[in-house]
Amino acid sequence: MNMKKKEKHAIRKKSIGVASVLVGTLIGFGLLSSKEADASENSVTQSDSASNESKSNDSSSVSAAPKTDDTNVSDTKTSSNTNNGETSVAQNPAQQETTQSSSTNATTEETPVTGEATTTTTNQANTPATTQSSNTNAEELVNQTSNETTSNDTNTVSSVNSPQNSTNAENVSTTQDTSTEATPSNNESAPQSTDASNKDVVNQAVNTSAPRMRAFSLAAVAADAPAAGTDITNQLTNVTVGIDSGTTVYPHQAGYVKLNYGFSVPNSAVKGDTFKITVPKELNLNGVTSTAKVPPIMAGDQVLANGVIDSDGNVIYTFTDYVNTKDDVKATLTMPAYIDPENVKKTGNVTLATGIGSTTANKTVLVDYEKYGKFYNLSIKGTIDQIDKTNNTYRQTIYVNPSGDNVIAPVLTGNLKPNTDSNALIDQQNTSIKVYKVDNAADLSESYFVNPENFEDVTNSVNITFPNPNQYKVEFNTPDDQITTPYIVVVNGHIDPNSKGDLALRSTLYGYNSNIIWRSMSWDNEVAFNNGSGSGDGIDKPVVPEQPDEPGEIEPIPEDSDSDPGSDSGSDSNSDSGSDSGSDSTSDSGSDSASDSDSASDSDSASDSDSASDSDSASDSDSDNDSDSDSDSDSDSDSDSDSDSDSDSDSDSDSDSDSDSDSDSDSDSDSDSDSDSDSDSDSDSDSDSDSDSDSDSDSDSDSDSDSDSDSDSDSDSDSDSDSDSDSDSDSDSDSDSDSDSDSDSDSDSDSDSDSDSDSDSDSDSDSASDSDSDSDSDSDSDSDSDSDSDSDSDSDSDSDSDSDSDSESDSDSESDSDSDSDSDSDSDSDSDSDSDSASDSDSGSDSDSSSDSDSESDSNSDSESGSNNNVVPPNSPKNGTNASNKNEAKDSKEPLPDTGSEDEANTSLIWGLLASIGSLLLFRRKKENKDKK
């Protein structure tokens, strides 16, 4: 029993013990959490006191400095990173808009990037106005670190081997300054503005932020900070330094210089190590912005090093733990820098020197501040020399009467620049104006740096009013109501934070000259901002308003012109050609053509050509040419053609041609010809014909013909014929003819013929004939010709042709032609021709022909004929002749005139017809054989 009780008691005692342990554990966790919260609050509040101690270079603050750089990278500070990220995003409007002194038509200068540098900006807080939009911890954190310049905000940023990883200001800032939560101070001092008043603005903004957390001991946080790093400036290798600028820098025209750096980091570098970049005192890194900041060096999306500006204006970079895990780290950096108005007050040559360690770069530039604007006795110039977009303030400095002229009843007005969406607020609540008198014009600095202590403050003696919205007015109220010395007017104003416009101001000086003529002179200032990129800079330019009474002339202000001339031309051409040609060409042509051409040609030509042509053509051609030509051509042509041609030609030609032609042609041709001809012809003909012929012929002919003919004919013919023929002929002929014919005929015939013939003949003939013939013929022929021709022709033709030809020609031609043609041609030609022709013809023809012929002939003929005919009047029943060489079977509906030799003439006509049909059949067969191949 007792044993059981003991066991029961022991179990109960054990249960009570477990519960006690659990309760105690929970209470312990609660106490620990409370202490951690207190520590967090203390660390932020302690930054406030630490920021002031940093000015005395406390040793503990130096040892804590490295933590400023990389806490964001650490995973153990996640909550701090979030707060800081929110802070920097809220500070977006206050990012590094480094602007140079700005004047008329100010231009925005974005930060240039070289090498691997990527342009970006960071948005760390400078003033309580921005930090109030962040979380409580981050807010107090940034407020206290403003004087420590741990914020990393400037114009450019360099990435290590990652030029493509450009980040905007918001992203960069989320990875910075978290370390200030645990780092009360830094070994770098606050950024120094070149203007004493700038310092006041920044310090005042910081000090107005009252800490919300209770203070605690500095040692409590310093114990957690790592020891200070080593200056490894002289251990950097492959250091490059460059100064990029023109030979002249115009500070009041957005002028600046670029400082370029590159280096390799030793593998022994660790987190907290630093290096130093020396910046010449003649430059500053802020332009006209109120504070100067430098970019962090980024490696992709990680911070490699953070930078601050020390009291001497040099840049100190501190490495993060990125270098602990990487070897062969390389970096490039580009920073824009501006001429410092305090250290460079006059126009002149300045030598700039910058470097990393023992590696330096030097460059001498001419600093040109340019002169004020002057109009008669009025002179004025202004500049916006300070912008604080965090507090939405600006400062404008205006030189009134810098020339020291006598101005009677002077009045200065300030307005928003006309025709702009200026964001300035000009009224009694938002604008403060100071006026200083300058006894000697030589005391004015050309850089517009003003030390108020050097001049007499006459603000209380002048009359300052705001007569209209967004306008102020300054009346100088001198005893004699005139000024003879310069005055400085300093305007401290505000910017409308809700406006999307840029800062644009106009200052105007009014006054009388000694002739009591009222005049005015204006000066415009403008600054444009580029959020998240670089700087905003201005361009100075005087503006002369319209004058109520103007005896003199105003020098015109040059304007910029923007022109974009453009021409559109397009051509579609596919050609494969090999050509060997020598040509002398003189041409006078006006042409309007649209062409689509596909050609493959091999051509060997030597030509002499003199041509004057006017041509209007639209052509579609597909050609495959192999031509060998030697031509001398003298042509004067006027042609208007519309042609479609498909040709495949092999030609070897040697031609001399003299032609004067006017042609207007529209033709469709489909031809297949094989011709070999040798002819000498001298003809002078006048023909006027109107024919309608419908023929259907199939001809297959094989002919051997040896002809030698000399023909001298002079004919005038006027014929009107209608012929309809259907012929089938099969002939085999051998002909050998030698004919001399001399005919002079005048014929006027009107014939209608309709013939249908079937002939099969085999003949050998040797004939000598004298014939007088009157014929109208419609023929389809294949010819081989060698001709010399001299022609003068006027032709008007409309043809459709499809040709396949192989030609070799040697021709001397002289032609004068007027032609109107519209052609569609599809040709494949192989021709061998040698021709000498001299012709003078006037022809006007209108023909409709449809022919289909089937003929097969084989003829050998040997003929010798001599004919001497005298010309008789038309319609004469006797001795009427037709000098035509055409062969045609005709069935006359009217009795033919008595020629005196009917049997012999009919026999010759029949044999000629048979020979013609035979040749047609022969060449048709050749064509079919060729097509089959």
UniProtKB/Swiss-Prot annotation:
Keyword presence, Endoplasmic reticulum: no
Comp. bias intervals (Low complexity): 47-65, 106-132, 143-162, 566-598, 862-880
Superkingdom classification of source: Bacteria
Propeptide: 900-933
Bilayer-crossing regions: none
Subcellular location: Secreted, Cell wall
Feature: compositional bias, Polar residues: 71-105, 163-200
Gene3D superfamilies: 2.60.40.1280, 2.60.40.1290
Region (Disordered): 34-200, 529-904
Role played: Cell surface-associated protein implicated in virulence. Promotes bacterial attachment exclusively to the gamma-chain of human fibrinogen. Induces formation of bacterial clumps.
Family, similarity comment: Belongs to the serine-aspartate repeat-containing protein (SDr) family.
PANTHER family in UniProt: TOL-PAL SYSTEM PROTEIN TOLA
Name of this chain's protein: Clumping factor A
UniProt organism field: Staphylococcus aureus (strain COL)
